[in-house]
Regions:
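N-terminus-centered regions that define maturation/targeting leaders and the start
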Residues: 1-92
Length: 92
């Protein structure tokens, strides 16, 4: 899976300012015909425990064609809570 914010490829463990990720990213992945996928984006470092920022279900060949079970919310960690990781997971 590849994640792009503003057409820029984001590498694993790459630091982004929250302002650079306020809009839905583009997700590219190899897919198989006749299979459905689910995409999760979450912040395991939230002060309230694991917090989901985006859930898309019933994805066929493009995330844009899936159903938003949870609308995208960009990163906005509270001040003085350290660096937060935002993890994308794709399930068949």
């Amino acid at each position: 899976m590849e994640v792009f914010y503003n057409s820029k490829f984001v590498k694993n463990n790459e630091f982004l300012k929250p302002s650079a990720a306020q809009f839905k990213p583009q997700i590219k992945y190899p897919f198989e015909n006749n299979k459905l996928y689910t995409l999760l984006m979450h912040d395991p470092d939230s002060v309230y425990g694991n917090r989901f920022h985006w859930i898309v279900t019933n994805i066929f060949n493009d995330v844009k064609n899936g159903e938003d079970a949870l609308l995208y919310t960009g990163p906005a960690p509270p001040p003085k809570t350290g660096t937060h990781r935002y993890i994308f997971e794709l399930y068949e």
